[in-house]
């Protein structure tokens, strides 16, 4: 493990729903126990993979409290709490902190495409409103705009509780700049399972992973092997699971991973609109891969 606060293998946790689309807290507790047993370092509920845009603030609070109660002090809980309206993002962050989150993952403002100064002011307002560590989530493919390395580094230097970035830009030049120029206590994590091996080899601190929902032990071993320079071992793990990493995005996340978890008997296959079940052909492809890995 890195000496930085935010590091290792973090799971971007799904939100299990019952058939009536209400939150299934029984399944949620079982998922938390699954990750404790697997050695996952951080659980992140209420993020993109947790269908956060469809959750009410009351549901966000209940999910975070449930995860925190089940996790206790065995595993860090860093909750998703972001949106594109700054005042609402502040409200979500304060709500997550009150519910017991030990850190907050806050997605960059989306759709309205603010300038870099606007992005800076957005995160500055959040940092001033809460005391827990904040993870910036940069995912241009979903938000429509990139948080520049210079903006991330400025925030990291100006605010002690801006502790990390989940970098999902696939921009290796930006990742390199962040790793080389960051403050000593600032963590850089990848949001791409397919990039864990090269990212860790470059000096990254960990991953916020979708595949960790299905194979948490494997993701943990991959991160640790790559971090400690056991590259042959890391390559072997990566080779075994890289097709699963890719198939988790055969359609929009979290649809494939929730289908997989349903096949594994861990949750019901229920989504909230506008997400809908996988196409039949994609179900067949993903199921075959899960069978080849011995997961179903």
Swiss-Prot record:
Homotetramer; dimer of dimers. Pathway: Amino-acid biosynthesis; L-lysine biosynthesis via DAP pathway; (S)-tetrahydrodipicolinate from L-aspartate: step 3/4. HAMAP family: DapA. One of its GO terms (molecular function) is 4-hydroxy-tetrahydrodipicolinate synthase activity. It catalyses: L-aspartate 4-semialdehyde + pyruvate = (2S,4S)-4-hydroxy-2,3,4,5-tetrahydrodipicolinate + H2O + H(+). Signal peptide: none annotated. Keywords: Amino-acid biosynthesis, Cytoplasm, Diaminopimelate biosynthesis, Lyase, Lysine biosynthesis, Schiff base. The keyword Ribosomal protein does not apply. Its main location: cytoplasm. The record marks 48, 111 as: Part of a proton relay during catalysis. One of its GO terms (cellular component) is cytosol. It comes from Chlorobium limicola (strain DSM 245 / NBRC 103803 / 6330). Catalyzes the condensation of (S)-aspartate-beta-semialdehyde [(S)-ASA] and pyruvate to 4-hydroxy-tetrahydrodipicolinate (HTPA). Its EC number is 4.3.3.7. One of its GO terms (biological process) is diaminopimelate biosynthetic process. It is found in: Cytoplasm. The active site is at 137 (proton donor/acceptor), 166 (schiff-base intermediate with substrate). The keyword Amino-acid biosynthesis applies. InterPro entries: Aldolase_TIM, DapA, DapA-like, Schiff_base-form_aldolases_AS. It is an enzyme of class 4 (lyase). This is 4-hydroxy-tetrahydrodipicolinate synthase. Belongs to the DapA family. The gene is dapA. Pyruvate binds at residues 49, 208. Pfam families: DHDPS. CDD domains: DHDPS. It comes from the Bacteria.
């Amino acid at each position: 493990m890195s000496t930085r606060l935010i590091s290792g293998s973090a799971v971007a946790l799904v939100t299990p729903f019952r058939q009536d689309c209400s939150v299934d807290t029984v399944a949620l507790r079982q998922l938390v126990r699954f990750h404790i047993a697997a050695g996952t370092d951080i659980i992140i509920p209420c993020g993109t993979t947790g269908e956060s845009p469809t959750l009410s603030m009351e549901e966000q609070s209940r999910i975070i409290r449930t995860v925190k109660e089940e996790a206790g002090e065995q595993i860090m809980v860093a909750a998703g709490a972001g949106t594109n309206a700054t005042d609402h993002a502040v409200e979500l962050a304060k709500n997550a902190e009150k519910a017991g989150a030990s850190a907050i993952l806050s997605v960059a403002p989306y759709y309205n495409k603010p300038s870099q100064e606007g992005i800076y002011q957005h995160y500055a307002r959040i940092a001033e409103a809460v005391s827990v560590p904040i993870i910036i989530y940069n995912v241009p493919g979903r938000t429509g705009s990139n948080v520049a390395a210079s903006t991330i580094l400025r925030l990291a230097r100006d605010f002690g509780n801006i502790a990390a970035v989940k970098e999902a830009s696939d921009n290796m030049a930006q990742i390199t700049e962040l790793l080389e120029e960051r403050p000593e206590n600032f963590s850089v994590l990848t949001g791409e399972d397919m990039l864990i091996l090269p990212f860790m080899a470059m000096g990254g601190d960990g991953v916020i992973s979708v595949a960790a929902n299905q194979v948490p032990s494997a993701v943990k071993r991959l991160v640790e092997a790559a971090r400690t320079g056991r590259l042959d071992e890391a390559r072997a793990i990566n080779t075994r699971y890289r097709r699963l990493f890719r198939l988790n995005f055969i359609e929009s996340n979290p649809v494939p991973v929730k289908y997989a978890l349903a096949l594994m008997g861990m949750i019901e296959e229920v989504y909230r609109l506008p997400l809908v079940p996988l196409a039949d052909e994609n179900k067949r492809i993903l199921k075959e891969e899960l069978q080849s890995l011995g997961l179903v």
